[in-house]
Curated annotation (Swiss-Prot):
Annotated protein name in UniProt: Zinc finger protein 541
Name of the gene this protein is made from: Znf541
Domain ELM2 stretches: 1063-1155
Pfam family name, one: zf-C2H2_6
SMART domains: ELM2, SANT, ZnF_C2H2
Deleted gene: phenotype: Females exhibit normal fertility with no apparent defects in ovaries while males are infertile with a small testis and an absence of spermatids and spermatozoa. Spermatocytes fail to complete meiotic prophase. An aberrant recruitment of DNA double-strand breaks (DSBs) machinery and generation of massive DSBs seen in spermatocytes after mid-pachytene.
UniProt source species: Mus musculus
Length: 1363
């Protein structure tokens, strides 16, 4: 490329350049990167360019302005063949790429139609050619969120995310979208076919579009698969690109990523295609299996051969090239301590000609990459250029950068990956090394690592052992490799500089190693020169491991699950054995020299024989930076993976138990602890991809005093301890304990398939237990102080529902606190080795992370948590504190969390989610009064077993009943919630009891579930008193709440243990009646009967039939409408007869004239007779209206009528219901109906097959046709009970045996039993339909004239109870 100069803050000298790629360069990468193993290209290349601009003094070719921001949603890293020697890569993959896609079951991707036309259809914001970034057209930032864009079109598209307008509406389902391409993708869901099928075992889901399948993999299986370009997102709209791809077949849907100028040798743009080649070549190496075994893996069939040129001098992007020791670069530089620095050092890929390898140099271990993965992913501070970073020469030079005369630290934070020619076809191979400048001591430099000069310029000089010149070693001047302030970064390379390398040649077929299962990972790359040793595995973390911040972004950590199905990980012993027995390139053991300098020498395992990646020493980020937040990850998290190395007493890694990638020049004290590549600490992949960042520095006791840490965290705070907590970050540490606390770059953490968005987050987090339960889906959020807070990515909830959701951390397991704390000798125990996988309790599916399990449980419950409000408001709105097991510990949360992983105390600290959410000023024992427990805050159905762990195990949610209205109770102990809603008295309460309070709670009474539905309408079932637990609350908590107002509450709990009331027999004086002692039976004769005699037969009623007939007639009159009160007072008539001493005349006079007159001393003086109320027509109409409006809520009916009590309304309803049920046929047309049925019976007589003399026996009469039960009222009214017709039951089978089948309801006779059965359906239908049809009109409110007339007609018979 043409040399470009930087501004005064730049990191590259003016003479630095990258040579143009020769015409003979051909990149032959064997396999398409068909798995989204890491951050997208934009995450790697375009982390932030706010401080860059083009040098106006240099001529540049046309450069699309939106390359840095455009169309990165579906950007994947592909590799492919390029028949044109000028272009590095073409977008359309070769047949091998398609084969690899088909191996995943995804099928060949279709080529976008617009790709051939050079067009692009991603919405109205991209039309025609793009503008060009220039000093006159600077980068634009969003005024709402501060996001930076390179063109106005990208910014206008971004503004759509802040707008609620959705102009594009689906014609099928009317769903609206903000962009046309979103609508186009949505239309795929309406097609009938579902060609995209999930290939996971036991899963047969199919989807109509690729994005849905990818989302299914991410959410359900926790695996990220290949991102397919949506059909609406095509190649760039530059027609000049057509001729470049005209000669190439478009076999798949891999769209062209940029116009030709982005691919040309003289392009000033960072070439993504080269990065794809790099990434593809590295990813598709074989992960060696442990042990000395050299045979191919059983999964070798999955790999595709690398089509490397057969010539010896050719080189490939794959690590099948001769590696060059990093020690050769600057081996003459004096070695010194590399202190961390405030500036964010960057990793740059620096190519090293493989010719250097021919002179014999030791291969560098690639473990240094391991700790750098978060740096490639961390968001830059305001997306600026990093301090002390080196600008790749192949990048466009943006504003604000000029070439400095000397190496000076820049004022930005930026991550960059140097673009290099992938396969220059010269003799030898290229080695890509990640150079990371040393860090300058940050504010906590005394804790970060060793101290030393931080401004010493670094230069890469050829090793004396090399026969090549510096120009031969590097395709660009060595000044490009140094960053301002890089304090002798070559010390990392000094180790093993005298070792020799056997020349390695590319095999003709350039065989690439297949992926192996995690149990087969080993170090047999020596036997396979093209293989990727375990030392190279940090590259996966650096390039392909996204942070676990977003909800379902754990799929990158589980990518090997999709490749190699194995769920197990190899142990420390396997790694140690493999590292000890790993042969060199020529079959002999090659050992790197111990690190030189002030650190104790360590025996280093042999270095890899593949392309090496060198990472400079770490640095301590500013406190506000996301990397600093990741520093708060406890070192214990790294130890959760069994493959992780143990630390010796000095804090250095034990060589016997550490993979070879854990040692070597990269293990320097200045290593940044924030470079933890494990998110959530319990990932099985941590053993396959060892985390060098979590290893202790080899300074040990010889470290400078400045590296020793506060709070007994010397081991954890060392530069290599990726999970160690910073002392001043103590309050946040337990919250994020064991997890990656912040995303790398905000775009690196985006949820696949969703648009990139950011949300500012407040990190002072306090929430109620229910909020914690609802937020347990999300992952650990950033936990730094709010002033230093950075933007983070939205979780899936934000993208689904929109809004801000604040990720609450997962609880720290108690056993992890005990077993995972650092012992005084620095050797943590493997407290999570047996719990490295998480199993869904519903479907038994295994997950590597808690986040994978929690997101999977979302789909079992079909419920997503709603977005949360600001967390400061939650802190103000609720009292949340922690109740710890050791009450004597009164220190502040800051010091307590500093000591969180210090094993000064042998007992496990009872730190639960509340203690992680508590503000920094909370003390040891502060009971929490959760007054909202009775309002159903714990109704999410989550069960957490504190004996096993405190982690969240989401269970399937049960449908919860609605809060029921009940009148407020007179008790003032518990105030009702909004709207007077109380927990049902028929619901057994649920306590969340702390360990200290378990013995204080009395056993709650168990109430069986009600027979009626708790959610039915009406207030009759629930009594208007509070649950008994509200009264018992202050009494129970008073021994604990000495200084807390007991009027708070209902129950004092900690979100620790959920105790539900199991069914049991309630025992006690509250539930059982007191039974008096048994007395002698003789005493019963003396006792007087206290009951009052209200009726007994008088005179000769029992013997004289005439007297009995007169009494029956009195009862019939009393039940008629003649009596005031309405026809149901048989009880009153008998009482009056008793008072009249058996005289029927006196009893009748009492009923008709003056009514029952009883003295106050009479036992029936206040007795209320059923049906004795008189309802006026107005009251009847009001009752009908109220009943139609409120159904059986008689309290509201009473409110509407106002003249009748609730009891009277209930009585009126049930009397009416009884009369409607039995007298529904008593209509004015009753006689007509009787005659009609009689005619039907007579007509059916002709069909009777019995003899004529038997026929009259079964001929029904009008009296028999009327059912005694149904028409009891009419028989009572028109005849005396003694004269009522009596039906004599016929012997069963007497008629059926003779071939006649009469109906038992209406006495119709049928000659076939089937006819009678069909006829019986008529009676069933009438029984259910007639009451509603007759008595309840459709429009009940207006009282029609017909109803009034009917009421008058029925008044004589039914009294006021009829309508």
């Amino acid at each position: 490329m043409e040399p470009y100069s930087l501004g005064e803050e730049g990191a590259l000298p003016s003479e630095g350049h990258l040579p143009s790629f020769s015409e003979s360069q051909v990149l032959n990468c064997s396999d398409t990167l068909n798995r989204d193993l890491g951050p997208s290209t934009r995450d790697l290349l375009y982390a932030g360019l706010s401080g860059l601009d083009l040098d106006p003094s240099l001529s540049t070719s046309d450069m699309p302005s939106e390359v840095l921001e455009d169309n990165l949603d579906t950007l994947s890293l592909y590799s492919g063949k390029d028949s044109d020697s000028v272009k590095l890569l073409e977008e359309y993959a070769d047949s091998e790429s398609q084969t690899s896609l088909q191996d995943l079951g995804l099928g060949a991707l279709k080529v976008p139609k617009e790709a051939d036309e050079g067009g692009r259809a991603t919405g109205s914001t991209r039309k025609g050619k793009r503008q060009h970034s220039s000093p006159q057209n600077p980068l634009l930032d969003c005024s709402l969120c501060g996001k930076v864009f390179s063109s106005a079109s990208s910014l206008s598209k971004h503004y759509l995310t802040h707008s609620q307008e959705r102009k594009h509406v689906c014609k099928v389902c009317s769903k609206a979208f903000k962009r046309q391409d979103h609508l186009t993708g949505h239309m795929l869901t309406h097609q009938k076919t579902k060609p995209f099928v999930c290939i996971e075992q036991g899963c047969s889901k199919s989807y109509c579009d690729y994005r849905s399948l990818r989302r299914h993999y991410e959410v359900q299986h926790g695996v990220c698969i290949l991102k397919e370009t949506p059909p609406e997102e095509e190649a760039y709209g530059d027609p000049t690109h057509n001729h470049d791809v005209a000669n190439q077949p478009p076999p798949s849907g891999l769209r062209s990523l940029g116009p030709p100028e982005a691919r040309s040798p003289g392009s000033v743009l960072p070439n993504r295609d080269l990065l794809r080649c790099i990434v593809s070549s590295i990813v598709h190496q074989k992960i060696p299996s442990p042990g000395p075994a050299v045979g191919p893996s059983d999964t070798e069939a999955r790999s595709s051969a690398c089509a490397c040129p057969t010539s010896l001098g050719s080189s490939s992007c794959t690590p099948a090239s001769t590696p060059v020791a990093l020690g050769t670069l600057g081996s003459e530089i004096p070695e010194e301590t590399h202190p961390p620095r405030k500036e964010a050092a960057t990793e740059v890929f620096t190519p090293v000609q493989s010719r250097a390898a021919e002179n014999g140099v030791p291969d560098p271990p690639e473990s240094e990459l391991e700790s750098e993965s978060p740096r490639l992913q961390r968001p830059s501070s305001l997306e600026g250029w990093p301090e002390g970073s080196s600008l790749p020469a192949c990048l466009p030079l943006f504003r604000g950068h000029s070439v400095p005369s000397g190496s000076q630290p820049s004022s930005h934070n930026f991550q960059w990956l140097r673009n290099l020619p992938g396969c220059p076809k010269n003799k030898g191979s290229n080695v890509f090394m990640v150079h990371k400048p040393p860090a300058v001591a940050s504010r906590e430099g005394s804790e970060g690592g060793g101290s030393g000069p931080s401004s010493t310029p670094t230069s890469v000089e050829p090793s004396p052992s090399l026969g090549t010149t510096q120009e031969e070693l590097l395709p660009f001047p060595p000044a490009l490799l140094k960053a301002p302030g890089e304090a002798s970064s070559e010390v990392r390379q000094a180790a093993g500089e005298d070792e020799t390398w056997a020349p390695k040649k590319c095999k003709p077929d350039c065989e690439s190693f297949p992926w192996q299962s995690p149990t087969e990972l080993g170090l047999q790359d020596a036997q396979n020169p093209g293989g990727l040793p375990s030392d190279a595995t940090p590259l996966f973390r650096q390039l392909f491991m996204k942070s676990q911040e977003s909800l379902v972004s754990h799929e990158q950590m589980q990518v090997l699950q999709m490749i190699a199905k194995s769920q197990r990980i190899f142990s420390h012993t396997q790694v140690a054995t493999a590292s000890a027995q790993r042969p060199g390139p020529e079959g002999k053991q090659s050992t790197l020299k111990p690190l030189q300098g002030p650190w104790p020498p360590q025996t280093l395992p042999p270095a890899p024989t593949v392309d090496s990646f060198q990472i400079g020493p770490g640095h301590s980020e500013p406190e506000g930076s996301p990397v600093r937040r990741r520093k708060t990850m406890p070192a214990v998290s790294r130890e959760t993976s069994p493959g992780g190395p143990r630390r010796d007493t000095k804090g250095g890694p034990k060589v016997a138990s550490a993979p070879p990638s854990l040692t070597g020049p990269g293990l320097l004290p200045s290593r940044n602890p924030d470079s933890s590549s494990l998110a959530k600490g319990t990932l099985d992949l941590g053993d396959i991809i060892p985390n060098a960042g979590s290893r202790q520095s080899q300074l040990g006791g010889d470290e400078p005093a400045g590296t020793q840490l506060v709070g007994k965290q010397g081991q954890g705070e060392n530069g290599l301890a990726s999970g160690a907590m910073r002392g001043e970050k103590g309050p946040a540490c337990p919250r994020g304990g064991g997890y990656r606390l912040f995303s790398g770059h905000p775009r690196a953490q985006r949820f696949s398939g969703f648009r990139k968005e950011k949300v500012k987050m407040d990190v002072c987090c306090a929430a109620s237990p229910s909020q914690v339960a609802m937020a347990s889906f999300s992952s650990a959020g950033p936990l730094a102080d709010p002033p230093r807070d950075m933007k983070s990515k939205l979780t899936i909830f934000n993208r689904i529902q929109g809004g801000n959701i604040y990720r609450l951390p997962h609880p720290v397991k108690e056993e992890s606190l005990a077993g995972g704390c650092h012992q005084p000798n620095g050797g943590p125990t493997d407290w999570m080795e047996s719990k490295s996988t998480f199993v869904c309790k519903n479907c038994s599916q295994m997950f590597y992370t808690e986040k994978g399990l929690s997101s999977h449980m979302c789909f079992h419950s079909d419920q997503w948590p709603s977005p949360r409000g600001k967390q400061e408001q939650q802190v103000k709105g609720q009292m949340v504190a922690s109740v710890k097991r050791k009450a004597g510990r009164e220190e502040g949360a800051v010091e307590d969390m500093k000591r969180h992983y210090d094993c000064s105390s042998s007992e496990p600290q009872d730190v639960t989610i509340l203690s992680m959410l508590v503000s920094s000023g909370s003390c040891g024992v502060t009971p929490v009064v959760l007054s909202s427990l009775l309002q159903g805050q714990e109704k999410d159905g989550e069960e957490r077993d504190s004996k096993e762990s405190c982690q969240y195990r989401k269970r399937k949610k049960r449908p919860q009943p609605k809060a029921l209205f009940a009148p407020p109770a007179p008790s003032a102990l518990g105030e009702p919630g909004p709207g007077g809603c109380h927990q049902s008295c028929l619901h057994s309460p649920v306590f969340l009891v702390d360990h200290l309070l378990k013995g204080l709670f009395q056993c709650s009474p168990y109430t069986p579930p009600p027979m009626l539905s708790p959610i039915r309408e009406g207030s009759g079932l629930y009594f208007n008193t509070l649950c008994s637990t509200s009264r018992a609350g202050p009494h129970l908590i008073s021994p604990v709440l000495d200084q807390v107002d007991s009027s708070f509450g209902i129950c004092v709990v900690k979100d620790d243990t959920k105790i539900s009331i199991e069914p049991h027999i309630n025992v006690g004086s509250r539930f059982q009646a007191e039974i008096p002692e048994l007395q002698e039976r003789l005493l019963a004769r003396v006792d007087e009967n206290v009951a009052s005699l209200v009726w007994k037969p008088w005179g000769d009623v029992m013997t004289n039939p005439e007297t009995q007939d007169r009494v029956m007639e009195l009862c019939n009159v009393a039940c008629s409408s003649v009596m005031p009160g309405g026809g149901t007072n048989l009880e009153l008539a008998l009482h009056c007869l008793h008072d009249a001493q058996g005289s029927v005349q006196v009893a009748l006079e009492t009923l008709l004239l003056r009514g029952p007159q009883k003295p106050r001393t009479h036992p029936l003086a206040d007795y209320r007779y059923t049906g004795s109320d008189i309802w006026t027509p107005m009251e009847k109409r009001l009752f009908k209206k109220a009943f139609c409006a409120h159904k059986k809520d008689f309290y509201l009916i009473h409110k509407m009528i106002q003249t009748k009590s609730v009891a009277q309304c209930v009585e009126y309803y049930y009397i009416w219901k009884k009369m409607v049920k039995f007298d529904c046929g008593r209509a004015p047309g009753l006689e007509k109906r009787g005659r009609r049925e009689l005619d039907e019976v007579e007509r059916t007589e002709d069909k009777v097959t019995c003899s004529p003399r038997e026929r009259p026996t079964h001929r029904p009469t009008p009296e028999l046709k009327i059912k005694t039960k149904s028409y009891r009222r009419e028989s009572i009214l028109h005849s005396s009970p003694s004269a009522a017709p009596k039906r004599t039951p016929e012997p069963p089978g007497s008629v059926e045996s003779q071939g006649v089948f009469p109906c038992r309801e209406c006495e119709r006779v049928f000659d076939k039993i089937k006819s009678r059965n069909a006829h019986m359906k008529r009676h069933r239908l009438q029984e259910h339909v007639e009451p509603v049809r007759v008595k309840w009109p459709v429009k009940p409110y207006p009282l029609k004239e017909e109803e009034e007339e009917e009421e008058e007609e029925l008044g004589a018979d039914m009294g006021p109870l009829q309508w």
